[in-house]
Amino acid sequence: MVRPAEGALATTPVAHESHELFGGDSTTCIVSVDADANGRARVWRRLGEHVELSEHTFPNWFLATSLELLAHLPAERLSADWLRQQHGHIQVHEPLAVVDLETSGPADQDAYRYLVLTSNLAEIETTLLETASKREGEEAQTLAELRGLVLIWEPVEQFLTLTGRTYFKDMSFEALRRFQFDLETTGLDEGRDRIFMISMRDSTGWRASLDIGDLGEADLLRRFVELVIARDPDTLENHNIFGFDLSFLVRRAARLGVRLALGRDGSEPRLETDVFDNGERPEPFLRWRVVGREVIDTQHAVRRYGLAAPDMRRHGLKEAARYFGFASSDREYVPGAEIWATYRTDPDRVRRYAAHDVDEVDGLSRRLLPPIFELTRRLPRGYERVAADTGPGSLWELLMVRAYLHAGRAIAAPAPRLQRVGAPARSELFMSGLLGPCARAEASPLLPRVLVNGSIAATNDDLQVMPRSLGWLLHRSDDSAARLLATAAHAYLSSAGLFGDPHAALDASMLARHYVELLVRDLRAHGCTPIEIDAEQVVFGVPTWWTPEMERAVSESARTYLPAGVELEFRARYVALYARAPGTSITLAHDGSVTLVGPAFRAGRLERFGDRFMHRAAACLLQWDVVGLRAVFLETLSLLRGGGIDLNDLCVQVTLHKSPSQYRRGGTHEEPYEVLLVEDSELTAADADADYYVARLSGLYCQQFAQAFTREDFSRIFRIPPGSGPFEAADPSDFDDIRPIATSLV
């Protein structure tokens, strides 16, 4: 139930240790914000079973380096003192106002010295763009494209930054009302296929299922909307919710004339562009925005987790649930292509399958989203935006801008990005090939501590916001959100962001590498063989006499040279390790598990047959079983030539951003979509190009093991025999003289 607020929201200054990390306003329990370019904001707060709505006006704003493009417009001029006094309560009485921000020294012509406040952003934007086009030759379409002259953020972020509010203050993740739903459809084309079932549950334990056994499709969608309104969730969640469920739902509703009033104001979902960034690379996607509710894709959370967990090979819902161990023992599985046919003969089986789907989405949400919830408590960004984008710039930039506005300070231009040599490589390999018992140790948290202890900051961070904030974060080592922010600090400093300074970042990297090299020297003194430096981690071979007591001795020794607050932590121990390249290795743990680490082994880029081959081959290699390695190769070769591998296992998984009907309308030729359009054809593995896949096996997958053998021995193990197989088992005597090797690279 949504009820209007009886009065204005409290704006008491926040009592946390650092307003820079939590915002300067103490308003509690915000679960969603909607704001627009006309200076209107709506804020929803969860108060137990009820949701309170309050409406606000605020000036839209942007930062500018010059007022030249606005010189012909009348504007109220305000001081930095006024801004400091009004922070959190800012209102202007003229359509345009300019705050002269304080500078730390002589005025920098490239500094963002002006905070421009307006009650008519659309008109100001049009005027600015026209003037820029005439005077500067800038052909920008939006203010965001005038970077260097203007900095602007989207309206929700403007509202939160200006007011000092954040989501979720004094609220637990368990108090958030989360709603999971999953569609079952007759196919993937919303133009011709239908929704025949929707399974639902929420975080209170309520659950329901709708299907066309009782309703027509249009009535099914209407009833779904009624249930969402009645349950009034704060979040809508599913796995690949943007790539499939909401897109399909919106387009089927439009085709059937059903108003999909899922917003808390009765509005329908609207499409926006957004960016998914897990810290590896930004990836644009189309987001469906539901007013008053945050839309969360658990696939984003799984992909983010998978970047740091090389043993997570796939990011699908079922695979992730099995990985985390909450897939039910009686979990119902139905192959995707068979779901509609199964429903027609055994609808209860499909109902169980769909119910298990939403249970697993809830499990992923509970497992992976609490740190994002805690991050959102600190940042002037919406929960759904933080959940999709945890790139370093998204975490730090607005946080720092908020601190500078709170202080009424201008933001100087970033330091010029001049070429500077000597930056240490993130990963450095000392040995390649197969090595015996090994361990992995990490000096943690080294880079954040170096930044704090040395007060290392960007040249234009004259308020020292980053090192001061980092100091607070490092005292919260048990806080997962604090760790995420602290870990991202150096990456942001290295970036081309507003407070990026690659020279300062390089100074920190060089100092951190110095400490890691001291650790390498110490390990050698204790009889260990360094194999690789990987950022703040060192992988090393251990002597036969290595004991837990020796680990403790190395840890004690490390305290004498590592910075205060940095501890040496032993992360893992391995029976054997194959070092292929910097940042790329295969390990055998004491429990027998094999883990492939590094971009060359990223499962999403590999056919399943190749991924399976490498795991089996690696298990043989790491146990010095050359005969077994040859047998795995021959077996895989025989299956490929004989059409014995399932067609799905010959495919590379790709993410599609358009529906089949959208692709058809586009008139382009894109191979993944062409494959999708013939998915119903009777293709089998026998139709696959066997020679192509044999070449993939030999030229890609086998080559991953080349550093483990001499060139001659490698050729003998992976020699391709004539014929289609099956092939005779390898004679052990043929390989008696082959031994895996290790090679020193220094």
Where are these predicted regions, by residue range?
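Conserved catalytic core of nucleic-acid polymerases
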Residues: 153, 440-631, 635-642, 646
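C-terminal, non-catalytic extensions of nucleic-acid polymerases
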Residues: 555, 563-746
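The two-metal-ion catalytic cores of nucleic-acid processing enzymes
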Residues: 1-428, 432-439, 443-466, 470-480, ...
